Amino acid sequence: ISLTIDSDTVDEIYWIEEGKKLAIGTSGGIFNLYGSETSYTITPTNFSLIRDTSWEAADIKPARVGNAMIYVQFNRRKLRVLTFSGEDVQYESSEISYQADELVGKEVKELVYQKQPHSLTWCRLKDGTLASLSFEDTMPVVGWGHHTIGGTQADATLGNHAKVESMAVIPHDGRDQLWLIVKRDINGSTVRYVEFLEKFYEPSETDQELAHFVDCGLYKTASSFTTAQFAHLKDESIRILGD
């Protein structure tokens, strides 16, 4: 099936996401594609292609959260949430980043969604830091956080902190793990580490050794007053958690 979008502008298609109707993110807005009001099946002779909103999309894969979809606006400095209105039989787009202009204003480069144990949408920003969005489509509560990964990586434009270059979410042990590729300067060389975020500490945990959250942390089981395991942390500030 070959279809042409009927638009007053020449638009580039960036992504297509499934749903009750196909949502199509373009440089000219969000379109929905379906068969008809009585049959959603798309055929060469049975289709409808309608623009639901003129808020354009960026070339970044959106994140599906429940029955909603979070996508990056064309300028990469705003996030919008796309929901399907059964009453109007169309998608509706509203900004969800108005409380975090200083964060997402740094330009969003990538989105991933961590469903379990908490509903978190992670944004990789242009400066290599992360922004996290706490959001569930059934709850009218939104929260934002900013996360700078430990370590140094000299950059006259983006700053001297470590830079996250890529993200992925992988299911593991009944939860979702956020995996990162992090760029750092170590002993005069630029290196990249593959890291993952440990699970969040829950108040119900009885093991107090789990009550820490560190960057690129190492754990030593045997008692010792000296160690040679931390050469990669030369010139870095460290803290020791002792029991």
Where are these regions (language model features)?
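Beta-propeller domains
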Residues: 1, 33-43, 48
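Blade-loop segments of beta-propeller domains
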Residues: 2-13, 46-55
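Beta-sheet repeat architectures centered on beta-propellers
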Residues: 8-11, 54-57, 68, 75-243
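Structured, hydrophobic secondary-structure cores that serve as assembly/anchoring elements
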Residues: 15-31, 54-82
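Short acidic-glycine loop/turn motifs at beta-strand connectors
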Residues: 26, 34-35, 125-126
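WD40 beta-propeller blade core
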Residues: 31-32, 131
